[in-house]
């Protein structure tokens, strides 16, 4: 093979195949919180199929299970618990809100 043809050949990269996110023994159910929580974002949103690497059927079942768990209040609809940290007390400027005695 001459050099001109070698330039167009792609090198075969070895890649490790990822494990499927849902094993064959896993049951997609609204009570299986460990499985369901893997497919939620930090904000509590359902992740897309491309991110999850699920088939269409699995994604549909996961979505239904998450929605059932939310309705039965096993899962929150929103996960927006923000940690507010106040660093010391802030002094208020005197002026508009002064109390009259």
Swiss-Prot record:
It is found in: Plastid, Chloroplast. It comes from the Eukaryota. GO terms for cellular component: chloroplast; ribonucleoprotein complex; ribosome. SUPFAM superfamilies: Ribosomal protein S18. One of its GO terms (biological process) is translation. Coiled coil: none annotated. Disulfide bonds: none annotated. Gene3D superfamilies: Ribosomal protein S18 (4.10.640.10). GO terms for molecular function: rRNA binding; structural constituent of ribosome. Keywords: Chloroplast, Plastid, Ribonucleoprotein, Ribosomal protein, RNA-binding, rRNA-binding. HAMAP family: Ribosomal_bS18. Part of the 30S ribosomal subunit. Belongs to the bacterial ribosomal protein bS18 family. This is Small ribosomal subunit protein bS18c. The lineage of its organism: Eukaryota, Viridiplantae, Streptophyta, Embryophyta, Tracheophyta.
């Amino acid at each position: 093979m001459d050099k001109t043809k070698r330039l167009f050949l792609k090198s075969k990269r070895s890649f490790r195949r990822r494990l499927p996110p849902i094993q064959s023994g896993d049951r997609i159910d609204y009570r299986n919180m460990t499985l369901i929580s893997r497919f939620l974002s930090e904000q509590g949103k359902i992740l897309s199929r491309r991110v999850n690497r699920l088939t269409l059927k699995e994604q549909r079942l996961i979505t239904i299970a998450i929605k059932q768990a939310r309705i039965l209040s096993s899962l929150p609809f929103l996960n927006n618990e923000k940690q507010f940290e106040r660093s010391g007390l802030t002094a208020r400027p005197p002026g508009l809100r002064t109390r009259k005695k």
